């Protein structure tokens, strides 16, 4: 088993998509590409990917339009470039799964993570949830001498909030004016991710901005907390909550692989330097013996 100098940590990354760019994420998540941005995808492993929920239409946008037509969600008042989808990528480093049973354990873990997503966003608002099991971890594979895969979950969700529609002042019945006419499920990224948890100092005093208004905890950081507490309550142990202030939640798949490759290269360079230190004295001794032989 490979050495593990780093703590196993959970991570939840959040990405925003509009109507014009969600198809790129769909092609990656649903494995519709002929080639992939992430060059570590092993196409023979694609059948091992696990869908906990599949879209009920051919595309994500078609499903959203169908849900709007059925009155399940509202796009009322949104701009053409508004955020319509959130992609939640849930992840724990590779060796956590390798030590706990590999593929089968990862399926159990991410099925429970999918239920967390259902509770957080509402089951009807989850368009797709799929565990990728086809992306090879090159560094772990080389270290262990066998193929090791990086298991993670992609969930595409709709950021929905309940919005009250009021009767207008032009309503003929004066008693109805200003009262609630209907409650709709409005797509709104900004409202869905609005944080109301204040930041405090060590003494518990609220931290204020320059204008005197309170500062609030980042909503993505709160998501990290919620995920960690939910998963540990479901019996999954042996990992920590992702580091506070970490930018890992914003990394794309390609950026993640580049970061991993950099770490792998640094380790390789250190090994080379270590071998060179051993080689130089041996080379010097060999040279000296050759000089003696030639005398």
Describe the role of every protein-language-model region.
Residues 1-295:
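N-terminal nicking endonuclease/strand-transfer module with a His-rich metal-binding environment
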């Amino acid at each position: 088993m490979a050495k593990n100098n780093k703590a196993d940590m959970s991570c939840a990354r959040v990405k925003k998509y509009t109507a014009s760019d969600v198809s790129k994420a769909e092609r990656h998540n649903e494995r519709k590409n002929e080639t992939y941005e992430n060059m570590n995808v092993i196409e023979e492993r694609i059948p091992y990917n696990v869908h906990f929920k599949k879209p009920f239409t051919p595309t994500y946008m078609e499903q959203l339009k169908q849900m709007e037509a059925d009155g399940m969600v509202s796009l009322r008042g949104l701009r053409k470039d508004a955020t319509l989808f959130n992609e939640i990528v849930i992840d724990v480093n590779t060796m956590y799964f390798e030590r706990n049973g590999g593929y089968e354990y990862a399926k159990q873990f991410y099925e429970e993570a999918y239920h967390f997503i259902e509770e957080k966003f509402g089951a009807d608002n989850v368009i797709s949830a799929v565990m990728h099991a086809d992306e090879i971890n090159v560094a772990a594979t080389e270290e262990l001498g066998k193929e090791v895969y990086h298991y993670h979950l992609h969930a595409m969700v709709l950021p929905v909030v309940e919005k009250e529609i009021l009767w207008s002042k032009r309503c003929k019945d004066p008693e109805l004016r200003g009262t609630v006419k209907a409650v709709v499920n409005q797509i709104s990224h900004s409202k869905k991710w609005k944080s109301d948890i204040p930041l405090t100092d060590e003494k518990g005093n609220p931290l204020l901005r320059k204008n005197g208004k309170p500062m609030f905890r980042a909503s993505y950081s709160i998501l990290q907390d919620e995920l960690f507490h939910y998963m540990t309550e479901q019996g999954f142990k042996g990992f920590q909550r992702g580091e506070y202030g970490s930018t890992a939640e914003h990394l794309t798949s390609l950026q993640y692989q580049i970061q991993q490759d950099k770490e792998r290269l640094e380790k390789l360079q250190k090994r080379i330097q270590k071998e060179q230190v051993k080689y130089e004295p041996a080379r010097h001794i060999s040279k000296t013996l050759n000089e003696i032989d030639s005398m």
